Amino acid sequence: MPMINLLLLILPTLIAMAFLMLTERKILGYTQLRKGPNIVGPYGLLQPFADAMKLFTKEPLKPSTSTTALYIIAPTLALTIALLLWTPLPMPNPLINLNLGLLFILATSSLTVYSILWSGWASNSNYALIGALRAVAQTISYEVTSAIILLSVLLMSGSFNLSTLITTQEHIWLLLPTWPLAMMWFISTLAETNRTPFDLTEGESELVSGFNTEYAAGPFALFFMAEYVNIIMMNALTTMIFLGTTHNAHRPELYTTCFTIKTLLLTSLFLWIRTTYPRFRYDQLMYLLWKNFLPLTLTLLMWYISLSTMIASIPPQT
């Protein structure tokens, strides 16, 4: 039974990821006044499966000077971690109900840094290594603000358990009282998933393709898949934290439907941002975090701590 549950989580996630790639290519096409993929299958719907077949049947070439073990482990680890992050998410029931669900997600998402660093180092290429070092610095930096934002939300929720957030938001979305945090969280998720305008790790104009420059065929596809699975996961987490859906035990399908619609809308916003904004300079990216986001999130954290203390210590009114 647990095996079936696991498959029912992994397979839809991978199918959603495949169609997200197609949607992105379609949106990019229409914003540039062209059609996008429309040959393979009706309206191009089978394009992601054709791409997967092509990539996984090609010979996985690797540089002769690369470190073989790490070179192969890195993309596999990236996709494994991306799929592992889905296990504590309540939709409305999680696969594994963890008391420290949010802490688990924060800790596990940090491990993605290792796969990127290993891939850059094991490739034995200067471009790949520079891209990997950029990715590590960027991800670690933005996780600082993400952790502080989550801590502020936890003070209002009262628990690290993700299911508690559903109860917390029965009457009002946390987006409304904490909108500055929500805006900063959304930008941090863009940076953590290395998406435009924060895709400095694969700056084509200066680093060829970044940390995955030396990858081809199957291993390259695994990195690509991990990126898109992470995008959907981060938007699902944003939906749970700030746009909570009321869970009716008698009609659980309503929760799943609302949750899916909100996640898809946020994911579409990710794609829209890619078509609209240019890439930041690296110093601007770091300046935004350390000089703007960090002081703001710390100030708001102190505000939410003092607010809850003030409200709790008001004497009862007769």
Curated annotation (Swiss-Prot):
Key words of the record: Electron transport, Membrane, Mitochondrion, Mitochondrion inner membrane, NAD, Respiratory chain, Translocase, Transmembrane, Transmembrane helix, Transport, Ubiquinone
Membrane topology note: Multi-pass membrane protein
GO BP terms in the entry: mitochondrial electron transport, NADH to ubiquinone; mitochondrial respiratory chain complex I assembly
Catalyzed reactions per annotation: a ubiquinone + NADH + 5 H(+)(in) = a ubiquinol + NAD(+) + 4 H(+)(out)
Transmembrane segments: 2-22, 69-89, 100-120, 147-167, 171-191, 222-242, 253-273, 294-314
InterPro entries linked: NADH_UbQ_OxRdtase_su1/FPO (IPR001694), NADH_UbQ_OxRdtase_su1_CS (IPR018086)
Domain of life the protein comes from: Eukaryota
The keyword rRNA-binding belongs to this UniProt entry's keyword annotation: no
EC number annotated for this UniProt entry: 7.1.1.2
PROSITE patterns per the UniProt record, alphabetical: COMPLEX1_ND1_1, COMPLEX1_ND1_2
Record has Amino-acid biosynthesis as a keyword: no
UniProt enzyme class: translocase
MF annotations from Gene Ontology: NADH dehydrogenase (ubiquinone) activity
Gene Ontology annotations for the cellular component aspect, listed alphabetically: mitochondrial inner membrane
Location(s), subcellular: Mitochondrion inner membrane
Protein family (similarity comment): Belongs to the complex I subunit 1 family.
Record text on subunit structure and interactions: Core subunit of respiratory chain NADH dehydrogenase (Complex I) which is composed of 45 different subunits.
Function of the protein: Core subunit of the mitochondrial membrane respiratory chain NADH dehydrogenase (Complex I) which catalyzes electron transfer from NADH through the respiratory chain, using ubiquinone as an electron acceptor. Essential for the catalytic activity and assembly of complex I.
Protein name per its UniProtKB record: NADH-ubiquinone oxidoreductase chain 1
Species annotation: Hylobates lar
